[in-house]
C-alpha cells in the first residue's frame, strides 16, 4: 500500500494517537424529508437506502449541547487510551458524522462547530455532509473557523459511486456535477475534502467500482482523503428489505481485500486513507457476517 493511513499521519503530526469523538448536530437529510427528488420527480423520504435510522452514525449520541457531548464522548473513548498518556496530552477529532451536518442555515451550525473546534484538546473538526448542502455561506463559515482557530477542518462528502444508475437506486438524490461543484469550492477555500465510497453496492460489478476509483484518482486538485467502505446490510434499512427479497452478491473477505488492493493501486500515493472497511453495529448487521469480526478483518487488510 503506497498511501498512508490517517492514524499514521495524525500521530506523526501531533506526536500521539488522535481519537475521534462522535458528535451530533441534530440535523437530518434532504432525501429524508422530501426535499430531494429522483430524476423522474419522485420525492425522496427515508434517506439513502443503505442508511439506518442513525444516519450512518450509530456511535454518535443524540443531540445535546456540544460541550456536554464532548465530555460524554471522552468518557467513552478515554478508557481506550493508554493510562501513561496524561489527560491533558490527549488529542481528539470532533466528528459530526450522522446525517447531513450542513443541512440548514450556516449560522445554525456555526455555534456548534465553534464550540467543538475551540476545545483545547481538539485538533481537527470533521463534518460529514452532502455536496448539495454546501451553499457559499456554509463554505465561508467553515473556512473562517479554520482560519480563526488555526486547526484542520475536514469536510467528508458522501459520494458512494459515480454511477448515475446506482445513485438513483440507492436514493442518493443528487447528480455528479453537484459533487464536482462542491469539491471545487471546498478545495478553493483551503478545506480538506474526504470522499466516502461504498463498495459492492447492488447492481455494481468490479469495473463499475473501479470506475468510481479512477474518477477519484483524476480529481483536480488531487484528492486529500478517501474512505473505502464495504457495503453493510443493516437491519431496518430499505436496502435490507431489498436484499431479503432478492439477495445480491456480497464478497468474501479475500475477494474484498483483492478489490481494495486494486483500488489503492489506482489512487494517488498522496491520498490519505481514512477507512478500508465498514464499522456498523453488530446487532444490526445482516450481511456480510464476516464484517462483524473486526479483528480478523483488520488483520487481513493490514498488509495491502
Label every PLM stretch briefly.
Residues 1-93:
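N-terminal [4Fe-4S]-dependent radical SAM core
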Residues 2-8, 12-21, 225, 232-304:
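Auxiliary Fe-S-binding modules of radical SAM enzymes
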Residues 19-23, 92-97, 125-127, 153-157, ...:
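Hydrophobic faces of well-ordered beta-strands that scaffold small-molecule active sites
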Residues 48, 116-122, 211-226, 298-304:
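Structural recognition of alpha->loop->beta junctions
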Residues 54-73, 77, 81-106, 121-134, ...:
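Core AdoMet radical
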Residues 65, 104, 108, 170-178, ...:
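Alpha-helix N-cap and loop-to-helix initiation/capping positions
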Residues 106-114, 135-146:
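Distinct, well-ordered alpha-helical segments
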Residues 177-238, 254-279:
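Conserved C-terminal portion of the radical SAM core fold
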Amino acid at each position: 500500500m503506497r498511501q498512508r493511513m490517517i492514524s499514521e499521519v495524525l500521530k506523526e503530526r501531533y506526536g500521539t494517537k488522535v481519537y475521534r469523538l462522535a458528535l451530533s448536530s441534530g440535523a437530518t437529510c434532504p432525501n429524508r424529508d422530501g426535499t430531494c427528488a429522483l430524476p423522474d420527480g419522485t420525492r425522496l423520504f427515508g434517506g439513502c437506502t443503505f442508511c439506518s435510522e442513525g444516519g450512518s452514525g450509530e456511535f454518535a449520541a443524540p443531540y445535546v449541547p456540544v460541550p456536554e457531548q464532548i465530555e460524554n464522548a471522552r468518557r467513552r473513548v478515554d478508557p481506550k487510551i493508554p493510562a501513561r498518556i496524561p489527560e491533558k496530552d490527549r488529542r481528539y477529532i470532533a466528528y459530526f458524522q450522522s446525517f447531513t451536518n450542513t443541512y440548514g442555515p450556516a449560522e445554525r451550525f456555526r455555534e456548534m462547530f465553534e464550540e467543538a473546534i475551540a476545545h483545547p484538546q481538539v485538533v481537527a473538526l470533521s463534518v460529514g455532509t452532502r455536496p448539495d448542502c454546501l451553499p457559499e455561506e456554509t463554505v465561508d463559515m467553515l473556512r473562517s473557523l479554520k482560519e480563526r482557530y488555526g486547526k484542520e477542518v475536514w469536510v467528508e462528502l458522501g459520494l458512494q459511486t459515480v454511477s448515475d444508475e446506482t445513485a438513483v437506486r440507492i436514493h442518493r438524490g443528487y447528480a455528479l456535477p453537484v459533487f464536482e461543484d462542491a469539491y471545487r469550492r471546498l478545495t478553493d477555500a483551503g478545506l480538506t475534502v474526504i470522499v466516502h465510497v461504498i463498495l459492492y453496492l447492488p447492481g455494481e460489478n468490479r469495473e463499475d467500482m473501479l470506475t468510481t476509483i479512477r474518477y477519484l484518482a483524476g480529481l483536480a486538485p488531487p484528492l486529500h482523503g478517501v474512505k473505502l467502505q464495504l457495503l453493510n446490510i443493516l437491519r431496518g434499512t430499505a436496502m435490507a428489505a431489498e436484499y431479503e427479497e432478492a439477495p445480491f452478491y456480497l464478497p468474501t473477505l479475500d475477494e474484498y481485500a483483492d478489490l481494495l488492493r486494486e483500488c489503492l493501486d489506482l489512487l494517488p500515493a498522496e491520498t490519505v486513507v481514512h477507512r478500508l472497511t465498514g464499522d456498523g453495529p453488530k446487532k444490526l448487521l445482516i450481511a456480510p457476517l464476516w464484517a462483524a469480526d473486526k479483528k480478523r478483518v483488520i488483520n487481513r487488510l493490514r498488509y495491502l
